[in-house]
């Protein structure tokens, strides 16, 4: 008896998920494999994917366009939270996983599958994100992870696929593992596993090398409504177009690259290369607008909220009660975060040079050092006396 009768497989068209199709059928006795590919802005990669899945042995190949949902329900929530994992990574790849898990569960329920499957390995983060997401949405579904159990190297996986008629889109001389969606790209493996190896320029597609960027700066005005980016240079755009256009503008100036050592969920350190031009600039601009419109205590408290939020996303806990509770808190803080932030793009830098909001709590009369200063200077001495009282008492008692 096989491990399942009908399986919905998360499908990317790459080596691992393509090999999963014959492996599930030949090794685990699965009768029917339905593949599901989520169109999250990968571009031309999804063109031949349906035909390839069928050639690999799938009985049906589904492609779901979820770009708008990806941006509005996942990316925009991360932006409102200022979510940067380990203060650097904007979670461009991680944000896609809970959405794919949701689509897998919906397809399994629609087609009467008793299991879902993915091609994640035992050392990666995505296995955790998929498994926990599926578990949270439908605990009755089995989760199959062939690549976690088959104990094959990448070369052996490619060879197994070739024996089963699976063509590989990756040349054996090109060892990089790449994931792409509308928000960005992640590149790992091969020579990049040496932390001292400089990434070759050819791995980058969304961002230009500094030497190839324009010699004049470009200014971009980013408009926000209640924490959500809605316009570029005064033009209101739909969510997908806004991300796409900003990716192009920002990447054209060499902004949006990350080269970092990150701590994976499973406890190992991994060297990762990321491109996320729009997402990085949007988080920076959003955080700046918050500084103009929110009180100091709310702004400071949100630093911790953003850190926790980023860890929940990274560790596969998108559908957790804590994340739901944090969403409610974040949404309340964003009621005032409406306005515009001006960003200067030039030679690998994105510098915020201006901001404005009808909800600004910045007071020029209080901040100025000019003649129209409205600050009561005489009040400072009394304030310092009260504020410093604990320090004074401590010093008196301990010196």
UniProtKB/Swiss-Prot annotation:
Q: What residues form the membrane-spanning segments? A: none
**Cellular localisation:** Cytoplasm
| Primary localization | cytoplasm
Q: Which InterPro entries did the record assign?
A: Arginosuc_syn_C (IPR048268), Arginosuc_syn_N (IPR048267), Arginosuc_synth (IPR001518), Arginosuc_synth_CS (IPR018223), Arginosuc_synth_type_1_subfam (IPR023434), AS_cat/multimer_dom_body (IPR024074), Rossmann-like_a/b/a_fold (IPR014729)
Q: Which GO terms describe its molecular function?
A: argininosuccinate synthase activity; ATP binding
Sorted alphabetically, which keywords does the UniProt record give?
Answer: Amino-acid biosynthesis, Arginine biosynthesis, ATP-binding, Cytoplasm, Ligase, Nucleotide-binding
Q: Does the keyword Cell wall biogenesis/degradation apply?
A: no
UniProt KW Manganese keyword:
no
Chain residues that bind L-citrulline: 89, 125, 129, 177, 186, 262, 274
Q: Which GO terms describe its biological process?
A: argininosuccinate metabolic process; L-arginine biosynthetic process; urea cycle
Q: What CDD domains has UniProt attached to this entry?
A: ASS
Where ATP is bound, by residue? 10-18, 38, 119
Annotated residues that bind L-aspartate are located at 121, 125-126
Enzymatic class: ligase
EC number in record: 6.3.4.5
- Name any GO cellular component annotation: cytoplasm
Query: Which sequence ranges form a coiled-coil region, renumbered to this chain?
Result: none
> Subunit structure of this entry?
Homotetramer.
**Which family, according to UniProt?**
Belongs to the argininosuccinate synthase family. Type 1 subfamily.
Q: Mind telling me which HAMAP family this protein's record contains?
A: Arg_succ_synth_type1 (MF_00005)
| Name used for this protein in its record | Argininosuccinate synthase
């Amino acid at each position: 008896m096989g491990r399942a009768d009908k399986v919905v497989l998360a499908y990317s068209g790459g080596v691992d998920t393509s090999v999963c199709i014959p492996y599930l059928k030949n090794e685990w006795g699965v009768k029917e494999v339905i593949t599901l590919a989520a169109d999250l802005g990968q571009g031309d990669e999804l063109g031949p994917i349906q035909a390839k899945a069928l050639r690999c042995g799938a009985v049906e190949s589904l492609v779901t366009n979820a770009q708008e949902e990806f941006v509005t329900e996942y990316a925009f929530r991360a932006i409102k939270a200022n979510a940067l994992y380990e203060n650097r990574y904007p979670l461009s790849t991680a944000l896609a996983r809970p959405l794919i898990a949701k689509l897998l569960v919906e397809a399994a329920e629609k087609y009467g599958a008793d299991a879902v499957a993915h091609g994640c390995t035992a050392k990666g983060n995505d296995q955790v994100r998929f498994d926990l997401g599926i578990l949270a949405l439908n605990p009755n579904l089995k989760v199959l992870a062939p690549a976690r159990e088959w104990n094959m190297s990448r070369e052996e996986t490619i060879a197994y696929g070739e024996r089963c008629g699976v063509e590989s889109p990756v040349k054996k001389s090109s060892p990089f593992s790449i994931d792409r969606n509308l928000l960005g790209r992640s590149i790992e493996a091969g020579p990049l596993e040496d932390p001292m190896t400089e990434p070759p320029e050819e791995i980058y597609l969304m961002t230009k090398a500094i030497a190839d960027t324009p010699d004049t700066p470009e200014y971009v005005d980013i408009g926000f409504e209640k924490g959500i980016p809605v316009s570029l240079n005064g033009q209101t755009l739909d969510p997908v177009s806004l991300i796409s256009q900003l990716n192009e503008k920002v990447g054209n100036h060499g902004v949006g690259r990350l080269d970092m050592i990150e701590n994976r969920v499973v406890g190992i350190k991994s060297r990762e290369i990321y491109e996320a031009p729009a997402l990085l600039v949007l988080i920076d601009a959003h955080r700046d607008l918050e500084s103009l419109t929110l009180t100091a205590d709310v702004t400071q408290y949100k630093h911790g909220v953003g850190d926790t939020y980023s860890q929940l996303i990274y560790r596969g806990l998108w559908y957790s009660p804590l994340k739901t509770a944090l969403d409610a808190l974040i949404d309340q803080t964003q009621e005032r975060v409406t306005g515009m932030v001006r960003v200067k793009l030039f030679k690998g830098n994105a510098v915020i040079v201006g901001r404005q909001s009808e909800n600004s709590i910045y007071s020029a009369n209080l901040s100025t050092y000019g003649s129209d200063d409205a600050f009561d200077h005489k009040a400072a001495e009394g304030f310092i006396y009260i504020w410093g009282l604990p320090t004074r008492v401590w010093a008196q008692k301990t010196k």
